[in-house]
Amino acid sequence: MAHYELIVIGAGPGGYEAALHAAKLSKKVAVVEKREAGGTCLNRGCIPTKTLLHSSQIFHDAKHGAHAGIHTDDIRADMTEIFAYKREISQKLSSGIESLFKTAKIDFLRGTALITAPGAVRVTDAEGGANDYTCDDILIATGSVPSRPPIPGLEFAMTSDELLEGCDHLYRSIVIIGGGVIGIEFATFYADLGCEVTVIEGMDRLLPNMDKELGQSLALILKKQGVKVFTNAMVQSVEKTGEDIAVNFTCKEKSETVSGEAVLCAIGRRPYCDGLFADGISVEMNRRSIAVNERYETSIPHIYAIGDVSAKIQLAHVATAQGIACVDLLYGRENHTSMSVVPSCIYCRPEIAVVGLTEAEAKEAGIPVKVGKHVMFDNAKTLIADPGRCFMKFVAHAETRELLGAQLMCKHASDMIGGVSQALANHMTVDQFLLAMRPHPSFEEAMTAALEDLAQKLG
C-alpha cells in the first residue's frame, strides 16, 4: 500500500497549487481527481466562460465597429466552433497541470476519493477498481457545484455546467434565473451574439452583494444592450411549453411569465463533499460547508479543507491562496498572504472589479469614511473604446486616510484591481497611492482622478 506525506483530494486551483507547493518542499504528494485536472475553474467555470466571452467580444466589436470606421456586412457566430475553441483552451491548461504534476513527481490518481479513516483514502476508478492509500495528512479541496433550489419544473433549466457542454446553434432566446456573477457573464455572452436575453433576480438589484451603484449601472447598460431585467422577482415555477420553456414569477406583486428556448439556473453554488466520508467518519459542518479554523483544520486531526468546500468566498484565487497557506502552516512555514483583501471581478461589458469595503459596508461597521469618484467621460481610452458609462470609486477612512476599498467599472478593470489590492494589503493611504505616476493615455488615469477627488474631500 502506497504511503504519502500529503494526499490532496481535488485538482482545482486550490488543490493543484497546494500539491505543487508541498512538492517544492520535498514532500511526497498525491492528488486525487475524478474529472479533469484544473477542476471547475479550468473546465466548467472561470476559463471556459472567459473564453466564450472573448469570442462574443470579437463578434460584438466587429458588428459594432462603424463608429471607428470598421464595417462588416457578413459576420456570423458559429457556436460549434466557439465551443470547440473553449474546449481547446481548457484542455491545453488542464494538460499543462498534469505536466507540472509529472515534473514535480506528484502522483495523479484518477478516480473518486473516499476517506475511510484519518490518514486513509480509497480511490475508485471509472471502471470500479479500488485502491487504498495511507498518508500523514489529507487536504480536501473538492470545490463546489451549481445549486438547484426546490422550484417546480426546474429540471427543465440548465446549470452552468450543462450549458458549458455546448450547443450547435445560437439560442433564439434564453432566460437566466439569477443576476449574480454567473448569470451576468452568460447574459453578456448571449446578448453580444444577438440572442434575446432575460435576467430574473430575486433581490432589489443586480449584483446584490456589491456596491449599489454597480448593480444599478449594470442594469441600465444591459437594458441598452437589449437585455430584459427583472429585479425583486421570485420564480414560482418552470414549465415546458411546446418548443420553449416558460418561467413563471412574481414581480411587484404581479404574476409574470417569460419564455425562452433555453433557461439557465444561475443562483449560486454549494460546497461539494457528497460521498467523501465513509460511514463512521464525519467532520463538523457549517451548514453545507466543512467547518475549519484559521489553520484550515477540520474537526478531525490531520484532515484539512480549503477553497469552495469550506470558504465563505467562492473564488479560484481565494482557494489558491488558502491552499498554499495551508501547506505552509502544515509544515511550519510562515505565510503572510492577506486573506482579508480579496479582489473580485465580473467579466461583463464593461468589466467590474472590486476589492475591500464599499461605502455602505464601512458605515454599517461604524467606520467614518469618505468616497472619491471619477466618471470616465473624459478618459481618452474610454472614449476610444466606446464601452458606455464607466467610473472608478475609492473608499478611505475619514480620519487616517487609509484606503479601505475600491469599485471599478470600466474596460480592463480586472487587470487593474490587483494594484489596488496591493495598496489595501499594505494599508496605504490615499496620499501614498497618489504618489505613483500613471501612463497616458490609459484607463488607469481615472484612478488618479478618483483619488484626487477623494483627497480633496478628506481635506
Segments from the language model and where they lie:
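Short hydrophobic core segments
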Residues: 7-9, 113, 132-143, 176-177, ...
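FAD-site-proximal beta/loop scaffold in flavoenzymes
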Residues: 155-170, 257-331
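Gly/Ala-rich phosphate-binding loop of Rossmann-like dinucleotide-binding domains
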Residues: 19, 23, 187, 191-192
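N-terminal Rossmann-fold NAD(P) dinucleotide-binding loop
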Residues: 15, 183-184
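Flexible, glycine-rich terminal cap/loop adjacent to redox cofactors
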Residues: 7-14, 23-35, 40, 47, ...
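Beta1/beta-strand and adjacent pyrophosphate-binding region of the FAD-binding site
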Residues: 1-12, 170-180
